[in-house]
Amino acid sequence: MNGLGGVKKVVVIGLGMTGLSVVNFWLRQTGDRDIKVIDTRATPPGQDKLPSSVELCAGQWNMNWLLEADLIVASPGIALATPELVAAKAAGIEIVGDIELFARVVTKPVVAITGSNGKSTVTSLIGEMAKEAGINVGVGGNIGFAALDMLVNEHDLYVLELSSFQLETTSSLQLKAAVYLNLSEDHMDRYNGLEDYSLAKMRIFEHAELAVYNRDDLATFPVSFSHQITSFGFDNQDYGLVTLHGEEFLALDEQPIMKTSDIALVGRHNVANSLAALALADAVNIDRQAVCRALQRYNGLAHRCQLVVNQHDVKWVNDSKATNLASTLAALKGLNLPGKLHLLVGGDGKGADFSELKLVLADLNVQLYCFGRDGNQFMPLVDAPICIETMAQAMAIAADTAQKGDMILLSPACASFDQFPNFMARGDAFIEQAKALQPRVAGAKAC
């Protein structure tokens, strides 16, 4: 099925932002269709926004609906291995995701980004580059706007962040360029191993005109790809780095573009992210001067190594977006603090192995605070960890003990779903409490 013709009965699995975008997409199409929604949650988010013409089955599956459907549209959080979906597929029912619907109707150029870490930063950065060049750009997918909602007002360019979950149900997305940033262990509760997880991400290259991979992470190399390939990395090939007169530059084929010291984003990992964004920007002919201006101005997204309070010589940093081990390792890399690091970790560990943190923490003056459902998994990593139920409790203890020169860093290495709706809510809670706790910080009490 290459378009929307012939689809009369649609069943949407999972409500929330994505599910609602799918429902609204179908309601905008011409022709009569029977649209139903199944959500196994008793009170699905977004239920109050569901049009009365759309029937909802909440709190359970409805196999009759599934088996009578012409098309099932599954939200990314619903695994294709779910028995009910396996049964529907075996009965010959096509199962797609919202990105596949987007792919079947979009008419403007699209670039896409996947990877274990850095997706949101690179996606947003390319969006800023396009805006700086005066391009009417839509930025979304796994970040910000649902992809289908961006079609309400047509754009001249679309930039999509795509998760492995979204790519599993996408088969015909035509891309001007796609980048696979990096691979690290994540979502091991959903995949049979790292190779299985990577194969899902590799689907981003299937219909791309240009594949961009990370030379410093060869797991991202598009092995079975017959179109144009380029790469980014920290050596001087393709999109890389060169040094001239003691200054390091972003470069293409050893030709300097701009100083890395002029990039507004902080951290070595963001130099790599800038190179990846540069490659995709070139693929859709975004003006190079606009690209450089965006790199000089864009200082990142909320919840990603975000300095939220710096008072009494104690820094509070919100890295709630660090929902896996690799993100936390990136945050810790290169830290050089005059005082102690108070590191808050824990939440929903998603079946990950956190032992790699042990060597990194051994080189830091660190007090570890372990909270949430899987916080106890971090306890063997350091001597004298503090294990406590909630992030708020950990923050209160850190505030009472922090001294001048210390940093209190939320970089949990875990998802938030055990105690928060999402990482943004966790980060917002951290920011709110960090501000409220200022009177308890040692520097404040000494005044």
Curated annotation (Swiss-Prot):
Annotated residues for binding of ATP: G115, S116, N117, G118, K119, S120, T121
Location relative to the cell: Cytoplasm
Enzyme class: ligase
GO molecular function: ATP binding; UDP-N-acetylmuramoylalanine-D-glutamate ligase activity
Biological pathway: Cell wall biogenesis; peptidoglycan biosynthesis
Key words, A-Z: ATP-binding, Cell cycle, Cell division, Cell shape, Cell wall biogenesis/degradation, Cytoplasm, Ligase, Nucleotide-binding, Peptidoglycan synthesis
Gene Ontology CC annotations of this record: cytoplasm
Catalytic activity: UDP-N-acetyl-alpha-D-muramoyl-L-alanine + D-glutamate + ATP = UDP-N-acetyl-alpha-D-muramoyl-L-alanyl-D-glutamate + ADP + phosphate + H(+)
Span of the signal peptide: none
A biological process term (GO) from this entry: peptidoglycan biosynthetic process
EC identifiers of the protein: 6.3.2.9
InterPro entries: Mur-like_cat_sf (IPR036565), Mur_ligase_C (IPR004101), Mur_ligase_C_dom_sf (IPR036615), Mur_ligase_cen (IPR013221), MurD (IPR005762)
Protein function: Cell wall formation. Catalyzes the addition of glutamate to the nucleotide precursor UDP-N-acetylmuramoyl-L-alanine (UMA).
HAMAP family recorded: MurD
NCBIfam families for the chain: murD (TIGR01087)
Entry similarity comment: Belongs to the MurCDEF family.
Record protein name field: UDP-N-acetylmuramoylalanine--D-glutamate ligase
UniProt source species: Photobacterium profundum (strain SS9)
